Every structure is written in structure tokens, then in C-alpha cells.
Amino acid sequence: MSDAPAPGSMAAELIRFAAWLAARNYSPYTIEQRNTAIGAFIAWAALRGVERPQDVTRPMLERYQRHLFHHRKVDGAPLAFRTQATRLTPIRAYFKWLARERLVLFNPAADLELPRGEKRLPANILSPDEVEAILAGPDLATPQGLRDRAILETLYATAIRRLELIRLSVFDVDYARKLIVVRKGKGNKDRIVPTGARALGWIAAYRDEARPQLVCGADDGTLFLTGKGQAIAPKKLTGRVGAYVAAAGLSKTGSCHLFRHTAATLMLEN
């Protein structure tokens, strides 16, 4: 028996939608995130006997929106408004595409409003002393420790995102001009980020002393490597950075995004 979705079903059209996104140079990460969000809605709809996009109505989408609002995580906490919006936005894009392709007569998600939460500054912002306590965590006697110190310094100096750091190449760092080129960042756009001398010094130390020990086989130029010579997986990076935050014994928790918020805040203050 084939596991392929039934022709004309939302699941089948999702495969076509993902191919359409890829043809328009959306990043694999963005496509995966949209697939996950839309797939969750498709599974929810299937439990209610709805599998064809033509059978989805505006009231049904509003019901799914209420489902997300009342959903509780394992710890009993509700989904943040931003998380709810993140799960609904791909569904709006999916039905907009279905309407454009004339696979539905009208777009039931056209006027679906996204949840709006209060705009607040992040509660967890590190002080300079707290940052230094975290930066002192890696064991500099090991290649991985020197790599991790360079990673932490880069996050703190640039406020770049987790995936942007993972994708950095050795050729993206301009030591003379004190710049880092971020390729295919948010919106699949490139940008140039000023970088401090201290962070560049740690990156150079890692590049010269530790990275050669981590390269395995062909070197594709990825800046930060695992012990197997590969790019670091997003969840792995989150875990390592979060472990250094926890080991510092602070009252605050977080990982890469904590550094991003802290760096952005300090940039505004200075």
C-alpha cells in the first residue's frame, strides 16, 4: 500500500506548496517550519472529517484558532501569542496559494486575524557581569571549548540569530574591516554586521588553533564545526549555549536568543 496522500487532499497540495516555496528560493528551514505548522492543521482537520481544502471554511479556521488559544503545553502553560501567530501565518499563506492556483474558489483565511499580545521587552536581559560569567564557562584546553568561546563571543558581539551563526563560513569574517557577512538571514537576505575586536580575536584563535582539529575529510568552509567536522545542528547549539548559561549559576535561563536580546539591548544603550 502506498503512503502517498490522496490526490486533491490538503496533504497532497502541501507537497506542491513546499515545492513552490523551494522554487522561489525560500530557505529549507522556512519550508520545514511552514510544513510543520500546516501539517498540524491538516491533522487537526482530518480528525474532524475534513481533508479537502475546498471543505475548509472561515468558521473552521476560527475554531482552530481557538484550539491553539486553549492548548496547553506539558508544563500547563498556554502557547504564547507569538507562537500562536507563528502557527497560523503559514496556514494563511497556504490558502492564499491555493486560491492563486484556483484550487479553492475563495480564500477562507483571507481576513483571519492573528493573535495580538502585549509588546514587552524581554524579561531576561543579561548584565555585562553575567555575560562575562557565561563566557568564562568553556574549557579552553579543548578544541570544542575554544570553539564554544568563539561562538558565545560572536553571539554577544553581533546579536545574530542561531541559524545565521550556524551557516557562517570562514570566508564570511572580515578581520580587517571588523565585519561579518550574514548570508541568507531572515527573509533569505544577506547583510553585513559590525563585529567587535574581542570577538574577532576569539574567532581567529578558534580558526587557527581548534578548527583544524575538527575538520574531517573535505572542508566545505563551515566556520563552526562539530567533532565530526560537520555544521552544528540548531538544537545542539541551543543545548550547548543553554548549558553554559545554567552552569554560570545565574537566576536567568535561556540560550542563543538570550544573547541576542542582551546584545541588541546593549547596542541600543550604547
Regions found by a protein language model. Give the residues of each.
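Conserved catalytic core of the tyrosine transesterase superfamily
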Residues: M1-N270
